[in-house]
Amino acid sequence: MNNNTGLKVSVLMLTYNQERYINEAIRSVMLQETNFPFELVIGNDASTDCTGTICADWQKKYPEQIVLFNRKKNLGLQQNFIQTYAQCRGQYIAICEGDDFWTDKRKLQIQADFLDTHPDYSTCFHRVINYYEDRGTKSLSNGGQKQDTDISDLARSNYISNVSALFRRGLFGELPEWFARVSTYDYAIHLLNAQFGKIHYIKRPMAVYRQHGKAIWSEAGTDRKLDIALVVDRKSTRLN
């Protein structure tokens, strides 16, 4: 897909009733140090708390860089993603949900530099700190993770934390019709992208993935392989 805006990265942020966390999430994005322009596209799914007001305050501070959709009607996770994704204009897309945050100011630069110099890769992701808020404990993700993988690896399990991903926009054209029916968007979007290039892992931890009881889209269901048959090209995938 051509990018005529000059934007290197669109950061896609979905949020709903996350007034406790959204400031930290947005701040971590706006503190990124890059040699390229990027935008933050926020889809606030009709929050009933102060999330929308907080987002609007940030948008007033950075009107040229933050695009805010304060939805009047709750769309649900999948439709909120679909509609927010459609507004992203960058060459690459990163994801930071409203209760997660980035910890490395060079995260976007490091990942964009990799994709710039490795055109045969569709996606790169990195290690994250899993923060279990209810217990107050932390752990590092992706122990023993291979540095380079492809769609056949990803079809077995989703090892990409959303808050860590950077991927090329428009590899597969428009989102397919079935996309609205999957339980969560993350696995499906990574599989769609992986049809068109390899996946690279950066061992450096650069974000916090917050896990807590009120996270409305953490591990939504166990059938994470729903619709894989529609996503994975059998000619390019080798499952044992």
Where are the language model's segments positioned?
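Conserved nucleotide-sugar donor-binding catalytic segment
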Residues: A86, H126, N142-R224, I228-A229
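Conserved small/polar residues in nucleotide/adenosyl-binding loops
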Residues: T237-N240
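A conserved acidic beta->alpha catalytic loop
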Residues: N44-T53, K73, E97
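Cell-envelope/extracellular polymer assembly enzymes that use nucleotide-activated donors
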Residues: L7-S10, E39, A188
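Conserved donor NDP-sugar-binding/catalytic core segment of glycosyltransferases
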Residues: K105-K138
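Short aromatic/hydrophobic "clamp" motif used to bind/position activated sugar donors
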Residues: I93
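Short, acidic, metal-binding catalytic loop of nucleotide-sugar glycosyltransferases
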Residues: R27-P37
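Glycine-rich, basic loop-to-helix element that forms the pyrophosphate-binding segment
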Residues: R71-C88, I110
